Amino acid sequence: MAAYLLAVAILFCIQGWPSGTVQGQVMPFMEVYSRSACQTRETLVPILKEYPDEVSHLFKPSCVPVLRCGGCCSDESLTCTATGKHSVGREIMRVDPHKGTSKMEVMQFKEHTACECRPRSPGDVNNGKDKRNPEEGGPRARFPFV
C-alpha cells in the first residue's frame, strides 16, 4: 500500500496535481495574452443600434458580423480605439410587418480596419466604471446594502 501511495505521489509531482479540468482545456498564457490584445475582431452588431430610425421594420438576421476594435490595453488610462474604418455591405432581409412584405437588400455598416490603445477622454475614465466613491475618495463598497 505504501508503494502505491508513493507511486501516486510521484506521478502527481511529474504530471501536476489534477485541477478538475480535462487536459487541453487550459489556454496557455501567450495565447490568452495575444487574443486579449487590442485588435479588430468579429463582433455581432444589432442592426437597430446602427440604424435606430428603422424601428418600424424587422430585420433578418437582427444583427450582423463586422470587424470592430476590442481587447485590453496595458494601462487603465488607455482604451482600444479604431484608427481606421471603411464601409462594408451586408445582405439583410427587411420585413415590413404593417404591409406584410419583405425584401432582400444590402445595408452598409462601419467596419474597423486598424486599432490602437489611446488615452481615454477625461469623461471616460475607467469606461464610466470608476471604482472610487467620489464622496469619500476611497473604493466603492462591493455590497453597499450590507
From Swiss-Prot:
GO terms (molecular function) for this protein are: chemoattractant activity; growth factor activity; toxin activity; vascular endothelial growth factor receptor binding
Q: Where in the cell is it found?
A: Secreted
Principal cellular location given in the protein's record? secreted
**Compositionally biased region (Basic and acidic residues):** 118-139
The entry's keywords: Disulfide bond, Growth factor, Pyrrolidone carboxylic acid, Secreted, Signal, Toxin
Q: Where is this region: Disordered?
A: 118-146
Tissues in which the UniProt entry reports expression: Expressed by the venom gland.
Q: Name one GO cellular component term.
A: membrane
Does rRNA-binding appear among the keywords? Answer: no
Which residues does this entry mark as bearing Pyrrolidone carboxylic acid? 25
Q: What highest taxon heads this organism's lineage? A: Eukaryota
Disulfide bond positions: 38-80, 69-115, 73-117
Q: Give the range the annotation lists for the signal sequence.
A: 1-24
Q: Subunit structure, per the record?
A: Homodimer; disulfide-linked. Interacts with VEGF receptor-1 (FLT1) with a high affinity, whereas it binds to VEGF receptor-2 (KDR) with a low affinity. Does not bind VEGF receptor-3 (FLT4).
**Other observations noted:** IC(50) to VEGF receptor-1 is 30 ng/ml and IC(50) to VEGF receptor-2 is 254 ng/ml.
| Family as reported in the entry's similarity comment | Belongs to the PDGF/VEGF growth factor family. Snake venom VEGF subfamily.
Function of the protein = Snake venom VEGFs may contribute to venom dispersion and prey subjugation by inducing vascular permeability and hypotension. This protein strongly increases vascular permeability, and weakly stimulates angiogenesis. Interacts with VEGF receptor-1 (FLT1) with a high affinity, whereas it binds to VEGF receptor-2 (KDR) with a low affinity. Stimulates autophosphorylation of VEGF receptor-1 (VEGFR-1/FLT1), and VEGF receptor-2 (VEGFR-2/KDR).
Name listed for the protein in its UniProt record: Snake venom vascular endothelial growth factor toxin TfsvVEGF
Lineage summary: Eukaryota, Metazoa, Chordata, Craniata, Vertebrata
